[in-house]
Amino acid sequence: MQSAATVPILEPRKVLKEFFGFDGFKGNQEAVVNSVLAGEDCFVIMPTGAGKSMCYQLPAMMMEGTAIVISPLIALMKNQVDNIRGFAQKSSLAHFLNSSLSKAELNQVIEDMLSGETKLLYVAPETLKKEETIDLLKQVKISFVAVDEAHCIS
């Protein structure tokens, strides 16, 4: 993960409770979150269910701009976005961008991105290569980029 954004004064534990409903961190999550908030590059290896996603989701909610999350599976993207929207109760905070979107859904993603409301954007690797995606991302402030699955890297 790489960061170039400024961090507001919010306390990570308060945001953890507000957006995700958790009272505390698991394992090394807090150290990773603090590193991301400090603008440090991070490489995180955790087993399934250990809370890797929180390591980028929480900083994204706290930082200025939109975090780009590269994720290979449409179902995983949808699940992550649905979970965030469920706690935050604001659909514009998280979106995914992939081939499953209708034209109306795509237009809503673009509108929310350009308005600065979107904090997390999940993107499939093949979508990230498209010229229209690149053009959209050039118009928004990107807080950092996270690669959610190692097999997205080659």
Predicted regions and their residues:
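Loop/turn-to-beta-strand initiation segments
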Residues: 41-42, 65-68, 117-121, 141-144
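Conserved pre-motif I regulatory segment
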Residues: 2-47
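SF2 helicase catalytic motif II
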Residues: 118-119, 127-129, 133-154
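Conserved nucleic-acid-binding Ia/Ib motif block in the N-terminal RecA-like helicase ATPase lobe
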Residues: 67-68, 74-130
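Short hydrophobic/charged patches on amphipathic alpha-helices used for structural packing
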Residues: 33, 57, 107-110, 134
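Walker A/P-loop
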Residues: 39-58, 68-73
